């Protein structure tokens, strides 16, 4: 985050020079100093990718509860990004805001077909996230104006097909296996769709089931970690563990580095190269953490996506961080005894789903709970 913050002058320069807008936007393929390096233009020069960087700032606030960081870092970064995107959006015949051009990384590779009918679900999900989160930021800082809500209200809803779920764009569905699940950004990593909502549930199920149906032929290493997260979004621990096992067995070198292709020729995908990249290892680790702990809207759930194979095995973790800086430590023994300790780093209230109760703590306070499977019944 400090690195991204240090590149704000370059982001402002690129927004002005390339897009002709105010605000800030980094090139999506850049050198260490923030200079544009180029690449397939529909992805390397896509302005909505900047919103993914914004999410990193907000996630830091969400998991720390640091209001000073929200005020001095998150709000300025989001606002500068929104200034760029707002100028690029144009009102269509139906009154909805659309980008001049739209894509969905890396659908159709670098062919002309990769320019999708605006707005792609990738772009649209990120735009909704940007303006909706700005509304939340203003509310949390006590200075709501209604401005960002008015912009978000002029964005169309996500494009959905009843059988295949989230579409690529308003007039195109995903018809073949592909390494990027960019059309599913609203599920992961943006977490805009909630499985507990019946309407969202049907969209999530259709989207994930369709990806599974198309198969992993054109997936690469990071696809398996991403699919694990999509399975976790619907509490499918078995499905998540299956994808993580495939990732670890077929895409990691002996030293743990991710090599992106099925370099052992095991048959799990059609790519057999071995380019080293870092992000997929982090993605898989993130998926494991989300199997252990879910934290949304101050509702905390331990083992939200527990695989069947873990049911009778000991499980333990210490000081995983939930929303508003709540530190969670948990242990389950093989004979079904559970212990949970929560410690606050900020004042707050949280609902503990596993114990079905609210806990209110001041910074530095902790609370412990114990139960057995019989108690729970």
What function would you assign to each model-found segment?
Residues 80-137:
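Acidic/histidine-rich catalytic neighborhood
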Residues 3, 15-16, 82, 95-98, ...:
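Beta-sheet entry/capping signal
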Residues 70-72, 90-100, 143-147, 302:
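Short, glycine/acidic-rich hinge or "gate" loops at secondary-structure transitions
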Residues 26-42, 107-116:
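Aromatic- and acidic-residue-enriched carbohydrate-binding clefts of CAZyme catalytic domains
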Residues 94, 233, 238-375:
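Non-catalytic C-terminal accessory modules of carbohydrate-active enzymes
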Residues 73, 77:
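Active-site and adjacent substrate-binding regions of carbohydrate-active enzymes
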Residues 1-13, 17-24, 35, 42-67, ...:
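Active-site core of glycosidic bond-cleaving carbohydrate-active enzymes
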Residues 8, 30-32, 101-106, 191:
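Short, flexible loop/turn elements at secondary-structure junctions
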């Amino acid at each position: 985050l400090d690195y991204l913050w240090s590149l704000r002058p370059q982001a402002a320069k690129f927004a002005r020079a390339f897009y002709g807008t105010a605000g800030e936007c980094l090139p999506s393929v850049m050198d260490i100093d923030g200079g544009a390096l180029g690449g397939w233009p529909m992805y390397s020069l896509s302005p909505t990718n900047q919103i993914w960087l914004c999410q990193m700032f907000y996630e830091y606030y969400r998991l720390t509860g640091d209001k000073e960081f929200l005020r001095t870092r998150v709000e300025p970064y989001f606002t500068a990004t929104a200034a760029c995107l707002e100028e690029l959006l144009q009102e269509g015949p139906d009154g909805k805001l659309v980008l001049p051009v739209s894509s969905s990384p890396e659908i159709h590779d670098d062919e002309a077909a990769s320019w999708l009918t605006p707005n792609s679900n990738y772009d649209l999900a990120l735009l909704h996230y940007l303006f909706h989160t700005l509304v939340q930021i203003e509310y949390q800082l006590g200075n709501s104006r209604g401005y960002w809500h008015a912009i978000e209200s002029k964005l169309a809803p996500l494009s959905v097909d009843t059988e295949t779920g989230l579409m690529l764009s308003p007039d195109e569905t995903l018809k073949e296996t592909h390494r990027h699940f960019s059309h599913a950004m609203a599920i992961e990593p943006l977490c805009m769709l909630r499985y507990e909502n019946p309407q969202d549930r049907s969209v999530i199920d259709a989207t994930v089931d369709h990806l599974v149906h198309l198969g992993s032929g054109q997936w690469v290493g990071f696809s398996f970690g991403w699919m694990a997260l999509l399975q976790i979004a619907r509490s499918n621990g078995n499905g998540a563990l299956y994808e993580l096992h495939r990732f670890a067995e077929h895409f990691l070198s002996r030293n743990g580095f991710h090599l992106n292709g099925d370099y052992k020729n095991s048959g799990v995908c059609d790519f057999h190269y071995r380019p080293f990249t870092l992000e997929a290892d982090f993605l898989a680790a993130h998926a494991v953490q989300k199997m252990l702990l879910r934290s949304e809207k101050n509702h905390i759930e331990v083992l939200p996506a527990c695989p069947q194979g873990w049911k009778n095995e000991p499980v333990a973790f210490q000081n995983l961080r939930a929303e508003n800086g709540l530190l969670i430590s948990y242990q389950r023994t093989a004979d079904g005894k559970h212990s949970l300790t929560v410690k606050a780093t900020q004042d707050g209230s949280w609902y503990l789903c596993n114990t079905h109760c609210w806990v209110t703590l001041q910074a530095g306070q902790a609370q412990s709970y114990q139960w057995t499977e019989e108690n729970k019944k």
